[in-house]
Amino acid sequence: MSSAMQGPAVTSSSTFLSNIIGKPVNVKLHSGMLYQGTLESIDGFMNVALVDASEYYESEQNPVIHRYESDVFLRGTQVMYISEL
């Protein structure tokens, strides 16, 4: 197959997560809560630490429920997805 016909490069989830540390992210929980902040750290259990985070219900179009000036820790079992902003 020629290089022009190849699809996008596949990135492993661990590579993706290590590359977005220090960048702004959305973290959606199974409860429907959405957190936006800077990804400070993440571990193998998907436990997440954010700084300068805002908390929303369902989407960022809804009003901010709370803004956190210090760290926010989210338990990995509650995380539905993490996306880079």
Swiss-Prot record:
Keywords: Cytoplasm, mRNA processing, mRNA splicing, Nucleus, Ribonucleoprotein, RNA-binding, rRNA processing, Spliceosome, tRNA processing. It is found in: Cytoplasm; Nucleus. Gene3D superfamilies: 2.30.30.100. Residues 12-85 form the Sm domain. GO terms for cellular component: Lsm1-7-Pat1 complex; nucleolus; P-body; sno(s)RNA-containing ribonucleoprotein complex; spliceosomal complex; U4/U6 x U5 tri-snRNP complex; U6 snRNP. One of its GO terms (molecular function) is RNA binding. SMART domains: Sm (SM00651). Belongs to the snRNP Sm proteins family. SmF/LSm6 subfamily. Component of the heptameric LSM1-LSM7 complex, which consists of LSM1, LSM2, LSM3, LSM4, LSM5, LSM6 and LSM7. Component of the heptameric LSM2-LSM8 complex, which consists of LSM2, LSM3, LSM4, LSM5, LSM6, LSM7 and LSM8. The LSm subunits form a seven-membered ring structure with a doughnut shape. This is U6 snRNA-associated Sm-like protein LSm6. It comes from Eremothecium gossypii (strain ATCC 10895 / CBS 109.51 / FGSC 9923 / NRRL Y-1056) (Yeast). The lineage of its organism: Eukaryota, Fungi, Dikarya, Ascomycota, Saccharomycotina.
